[in-house]
Amino acid sequence: MPQLSASSLFICLWLVDLCHVANSVLSSSFSDLHTQFGISLYQTLTETENKSNLIVSPASVSLCLGLLQLGARGNTLVQLEGTLGYDVNDVRVQNILSRPQGDLANSSEGLRLQLANALFIQTGVKLLPEFTQHALGWGNTSLLSVNFSNPNHTHSRLQQWAHYQSKADDHLQTREELHHSSGEEEEATRQDHLLYMALVSTLVFHGAWQKQFLFTETQNLPFTFSDGSTVKVPMMYQSSEVNIGHFRLPSEQEYTVLELPYLDHSLRLLVALPSDRKTPLSQLEKQITARAVGLWDTGLRRTKMDIFLPRFKMQSKINLKPVLQSLGVSDIFSPSAADFRGISDTDGIFVSEAFHEARIEVTEAGTKAASATAMVLLKRSRSAVFKADRPFLFILRQISTGSLLFIGRVVNPADMP
């Protein structure tokens, strides 16, 4: 059965030598806030990333920033709240943020969604009990001890944990494994006060379409790049009734949005494509807003369509430090400004690096394609056609929360990792 598989990995390295809560009022539209953060994150990335395929998980990044927010104080907390748009200490926010895991983790209809965090703490660093309690209840968080003086061992542990989370089908690792010995604590304090912590967040998703793309219908068709050149790529096909809508950008250019639902209807993949082949995808990327995405909910209409969607697989590795700084989160990276007194009594904790890795694959199930299908595809019914044969934007969105699990662009489906 056709399915979409995705996973993301977010890593923060903290350099230790270690913000009062300004009570924020929860917005009446948490969905809009979540969407706004995701769009802002993506648009900031498009300003710095090259014109290649791109994918990011706003849900995963916001989960990590939320964990930081639990231990932030002063202006550090203000910046995190301002960027996310909400206060994770609000129980209503916590209930909403826990929905993705609760809604889908136990689905029996071809869906699997797993969210997990791990906070790797330098041996010898003592966490505050209150933070430990809150962290272990936040997004399936594990607290794990590691000696950062051995980089190879540390990297191996981070990768092993992330690999375990991406492969575990039935459960998530949520536990506390803090083991300190006096010798390890001594060693930790001898590192010129340079203690480390690492935060790893994973989001894994596998989903089956409500209506499958038959592997035997896939054929090689041209995909046109932004410069006008073409390449032949495996193009999936199906004819069915789907939700589709036509919208207009502030610059008056039109674009089309197609919705592909999953079996239990909790998630949907939205594909946005400029209607005019001469309109570059960058125009859509620059002008899309959270409000526009919200209007898609009411602007889509059920229509019989012939759908052509390229099979694609991509991976992005992103340095989030400049991106978050552009979004207004700067104190966490400053040794003098970062205020994480809610995490530990140890002075001088700040974030030195922040990386994000995301992967996605859209394909049909099956092991080999059939040939001689071009004539069949070219003689379909007279239904309207949606053909993603040029660069397009995609969003994997959860309906109940508005959370953008993934947002990205396909500019070259033939460029696969």
Swiss-Prot record:
Glycans are attached at N50, N106, N140, N147, N152. GO terms for molecular function: serine-type endopeptidase inhibitor activity. PROSITE patterns: SERPIN. GO terms for cellular component: extracellular space. It is found in: Secreted. Residues 1-24 form the signal peptide. The record marks R380, S381 as: Reactive bond. Keywords: Glycoprotein, Protease inhibitor, Secreted, Serine protease inhibitor, Signal. GO terms for biological process: camera-type eye development. InterPro entries: Serpin_CS, Serpin_dom, Serpin_E3, Serpin_fam, Serpin_sf, Serpin_sf_1, Serpin_sf_2. It comes from the Eukaryota. PANTHER family: SERINE PROTEASE INHIBITOR, SERPIN, SERPIN E3. Probable serine protease inhibitor. Belongs to the serpin family. This is Probable serpin E3. The lineage of its organism: Eukaryota, Metazoa, Chordata, Craniata, Vertebrata. The gene is serpine3.
